[in-house]
Amino acid sequence: MNILQFNVRLAEGGAAGVALDLHQRALQQGLASHFVYGYGKGGKESVSHQNYPQVIKHTPRMTAMANIALFRLFNRDLFGNFNELYRTITRTAGPVVLHFHVLHSYWLNLKSVVRFCEKVKNHKPDVTLVWTLHDHWSVTGRCAFTDGCEGWKTGCQKCPTLNNYPPVKIDRAHQLVAGKRQLFREMLALGCQFISPSQHVADAFNSLYGPGRCRIINNGIDMATEAILADLPPVRETQGKPKIAVVAHDLRYDGKTNQQLVREMMALGDKIELHTFGKFSPFTAGNVVNHGFETDKRKLMSALNQMDALVFSSRVDNYPLILCEALSIGVPVIATHSDAAREVLQKSGGKTVSEEEVLQLVQLSKPEIAQAIFGTTLAEFSQRSRAAYSGQQMLEEYVNFYQNL
């Protein structure tokens, strides 16, 4: 079996983490695997390119730049295709799995991707198409994240915000949504198998394209994180006031980090110590420690290991790996109500809470937080969580899925 993983980024973001981990685990088990990614920062080669075997940067910088510039007007990516991979794929001996992840974000023209898949399937029938949906892009006219909007259910008539990712100047989603959905139907007709790590994304997809069209395989922590976990000593009790973590790539974005909630935690003063991990922190106070964006996973996990809890208030994530990672090292997660957080926490027996409850819980000790959220002791919660988010289990489910197609 030959597997090609496709994702817009190589090592940035949750979808990239899943795709890259599947690629590395497949290689480790002796399967033939390559990872094709769109571009790195600024349209250049990813800074992580040399760190991984069998990876291919796909998109010329000018193509990405043109898509970025024109998307704000057209609401779709005008350029980008897989045509140069046609000969490589069709001349490969034996079955080939083309496993797509995030194909949007200024990378590829969707219609060109569908036409490419048609051409490849006609030439080489033993090509299997798999697409993991890491967001809601497959059901909307434009947006990757719904952020509470349900306009996609009625054809994206009028977008409530032009700033929702990916942002635009002119709203054309209502003009594009029918054609976009037709292209997904054509992928289904080609036998493409759709998967999502999240039940709520799968439910949205199935409501449009038919019952059972999208199946569930939950995300798991990656190999690098598993190696780090093996070396981290469990921290049962911390000294002093509760240490509370807030983690996001860009801490200014209210969709990922509820700004008002963080300020209310800051207002608790010397009752807690608030630690932020991410770029552009707007939070400054005597009880706040801003660590900045930590690219070294080992350093981030080591720092989180010292925390009493992680507060998660995102409205735009679908199956956030940071929750799996924090829970796997025995750090309780205090999450506000969202489909994504509810789904992840339920896997280890946890629950989401209201914003008012967050402000009470962050003042408790680590064992008390574990008891309140997970209904058990800190030791039992840690053991349960370590088993719940296994990356090896994720790979086994995917490989089993590939082989059964």
Swiss-Prot record:
Pfam families: Glyco_trans_1_4 (PF13692), Glyco_transf_4 (PF13439). Pathway: Slime biogenesis; slime polysaccharide biosynthesis. Coiled coil: none annotated. SUPFAM superfamilies: UDP-Glycosyltransferase/glycogen phosphorylase. Keywords: Lipopolysaccharide biosynthesis, Transferase. InterPro entries: Colanic_acid_synth_WcaC (IPR023916), Glyco_trans_4-like_N (IPR028098). The keyword Transferase applies. The keyword Transferase applies. One of its GO terms (molecular function) is UDP-galactosyltransferase activity. It comes from Escherichia coli (strain K12). It comes from the Bacteria. This is Putative colanic acid biosynthesis glycosyl transferase WcaC. GO terms for biological process: colanic acid biosynthetic process; lipopolysaccharide biosynthetic process; slime layer polysaccharide biosynthetic process.
